[in-house]
Amino acid sequence: MRIGFDGKRAVQNFTGLGNYSRYVANILCHFYPENDYVLYAPKKRENKRMNLLTGQYRQLTLAYPATSFWKKLSSLWRVWGITSQLEKEGIELFHGLSNELPLNIHKSRIKSIVTIHDLIFLRYPQYYQSID
């Protein structure tokens, strides 16, 4: 199976959600090596922890926006443009690791799952903007 992940945090964050994202990738690669795992990130960033993982597991790769258009609009790519790239690259399951999925993924044949880390926004909505 080809499994894609929102890899923004895995690539760009060195603590918190970045650690969580790398941990999920590490565990899945270790216990389910028959699958291919692709972490999709809007931008490249030097990250030694991520480099160790991709060096350790041949089935784990990084992917970035495929066209110059989406490279320039990388934030929009994460919420809209990524879906067509996932389809072209044969992703069967997409995991949003940090509370969100692409807005149009439901229109594709790709199954999806999202991890919600915190529900405090439900208890105290006045402290959060609607975009969040």
Language-model features and meaning:
Residues M1-D132:
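Carbohydrate transferase catalytic cores enriched for Leloir-type hexosyltransferases
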